[in-house]
Amino acid sequence: MLKRGKILKINFNNIKGLLLDLEGVVYEGDKLVDGAQDAINKLLSYNFKIKYLTNTTVTPRKQILKKLLKFKLSIVETDIFTPPIAASIFLKKNKISKIFLLTNKLLQEDFKEFIIDEVKPEAIIMGDLYKAFNWERLNEVFRLIHNNDTLIIALHKNKYCKRENKIGLDLGPFDAALEYATSKKSILIGKPEKNFFNLVIEDMGLGKEEVLMIGDDIFADIGGAKHNSIPAIQVRTGKFQKKDETNSHLQPDYRINSIVDLPNILKSA
């Protein structure tokens, strides 16, 4: 069933590109959403450009590709867009070559085109370090920023997360501490930030009015798109909750039961 939201009316005839969130839209955990493979094949046959979005800051793009290929999806590595990839594009656009990675080691793969400089970097990339993010590391990074004209690029700013059945600090508080101590504002890249959406659309060579966001998360996916003037559809899979339908502050343009409904909507436009 198709249900319209209250903000924009989508002109489906203008749509040339699709931003598909991965977790919750295409798959849930280690299982494809029912009918997702067939739906994506249909969308590709209609000649839509597709970018697969994820907010993960712990898994390099090649590993995500391996997972999607196991699902037998027709996809190449450059179809996948993550905060590290967005950060990489941002660095190139701003002619930044020397960086310090405050991320897990696996993410070095996504930054292999850059010089790792632990003395005088032009930018520090902050990702998820979990238990390795301690007082010593925070001080080390503080000194680098304090002593140099160094940008702080945060791949996300989540306040807390749940790991090993316990709630704990995520990247956001560490980023806030560095902002406060250095009097510098970090550049935030990742959903729902405008930087993330602007970079992926630019990478597709399309305008905002030519793309459509399909997501399950009312805040990161739908909110991020809507606040960037991008039309959005929410699926009733993944993180979708019934209370999303009565959220007075944020509504998608449409809701559908799952990605399976998407090809018919776009084809009938």
Language model segments and positions:
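Asp-based, Mg2+/Mn2+-dependent phosphohydrolase catalytic module
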Residues: 2-37, 42-46, 59-78, 85-269
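Conserved phosphate/oxyanion-binding catalytic-loop motifs
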Residues: 56
